[in-house]
Structures are given as C-alpha cells and as structure tokens.
Amino acid sequence: MSQSGSKQGIPLPVGLTIQPLKGMETEDWYPAPDKIYASNLALETTAQLQQTDIFPSVKEAVPATGKEGFAIENKVKLTFHPDFANEAELLKEKLATIHGLEVVSEAPVTVHLDYLPERETAVNGEYYRIDTGNGLINISASTSHGIFNGTQTLLSLLKGQEKLFRLEALSIRDYPDLPYRGQMLDIARNFTTVEHLKKLVDVISSYKLNVLHFHFSDDEGWRLEIPGLEELTSVGARRGHTTDELECLYPGYDGNYDPSAATSGNGYYTREEFIDLLRYAAQRHVRVIPEIESPGHARAAIVSM
C-alpha cells in the first residue's frame, strides 16, 4: 500500500519454468502387443493354488474327515429334489458344454441337490454347503438360489482341470455378504443383441452376481418397445444423418450415419424379447432392473415424442 492508501500496481516476480510438451514422437502412446505380452510374462506365477482357491472365494473350505477324494472320468449321475429341477437342468447343461461331462442314470460319481438338514440354519437365502467324498457331491441349501450358487462353485472347482477330473474330500460353507451384487450395462448408447445379453447373464450368474442394471434409455437412444408409444423406437432407437431428427436421432457415437444399418447405433428390444430376457435371467437367479433416465439424459425420448 502507498502512503495514500491506494494499491500499487507492481507485479510480483514469480519463478515459473515451462517444460516442453511431449509429443507422439517422444512418448509410446500406443504400446505394441508384443511389448504388452513381454510385460505380462514378467508377472510372478509361482503361487501354488489350492483346489478351493476359486473366484469368488468361499467363506469356508476344510478337508472332510473320514472321506476320500475321487476322480470323475466322463460321466456323472445327477439326482435332485423336485423343487430344484431348474437348477439341475442348468447344471446338466454346463457340465456338458464346459467340462464335457455327460449326465447318465448310473455312474461312479453322483451329484445330489437337496435341502439343508433340518438341524442346520441358513445364514441367508443364498447360503449353501457342498460336501464331497467317496464318489458323492452333495449340494444343499434352503432355497433354489442357494442351490444355484452351489452348482456354480462346483463348476469352478472343476475349472482348469483336464480329464480326468479330481475332487478332494471337502466340506464347503458359503454365502454372499451383500444382497445386491450387480452389473450395469449401457445399451442406450451402444445397442447389442438379445443373444449377447443372455451371454452376459450367463457370465455374471457364474460369478454369483444377482442383478443386471438395464440402462436402456439415455440421450443417445431408447431401446425398449412400449406399446402405444411406437415413436420411442421408430425414432429414438435409430441414429443417422438428419437435419431435423424427424425420423432418427443425430449420429452420436456409432451409427455409420445410416439409421437402417445393423450397427450399435440402431436397434431395440421388442416386448416379447424383453419378457424372454427376464425369464432367462430369472432362471439363473438374476434380477433385471430397467432404468429410465429422467428428467436428465432423456433427449432420445423427448425428441421422439
């Protein structure tokens, strides 16, 4: 301040060093695959895993006393309580398609699905136990969801093995800590087929995730047929070259500027396809939660209407 009280407009010196910008010629912005491969080779792979070191990990796995481990060649017998017929059918399919194991009426090894013994109380609705030994694999739970989780653990125990499969004599107790274990998929911006959605359901259910967050509406697209509001899909499910957006939305992301092309910019699920997806997911104990964006991120719906 000066004696008169006014500020003096004198700039203060500031030490500032400007570093030269690094361009594409000095930085490896896009590492080649061979460099990534070489880097991956440097990772330590010496850890000795146990048979029960699976993902997701189980709460408890201990050796079963008084029982012997056993081998599974190419066939198993599958028995089950009638309440678990759906889970038995899914297990039969996966044993065949993933591990090449045929389910027959008589075999040295039996897989049995049943309710928990009356003396045992489930921690929650997804609790299950697996007891293996002497040629028997017993999966028990208080609900069909628990049985399904147990079958996914069995499939994981067999992963990474060549025929002949071997199972140790084990006693496994497991349950999830969190009731909501979900995966969000944004198909508003990038559409995909129902077949791909079913594959996703298969994958997430194999890891015991139980929710598919179905993000089907956003600024860039509306992907679900609503009877009586056909314009939501006739306009909102298509992106392409347009000056007025009367027949389709602006390109945004992909679409090849062609609203009729089979790209991730175009497409929607019919009412019947969505119902089929819901049933498919429910069989695998996955809950589908549709999400309608509003009031923000609702441009596709607003333009369409």
Indicate where each model-derived feature is located.
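Acidic, contiguous N-terminal accessory segments
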Residues: S2-R181
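Feature activates predominantly on carbohydrate-active enzymes
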Residues: V123, Y127, D131-M305
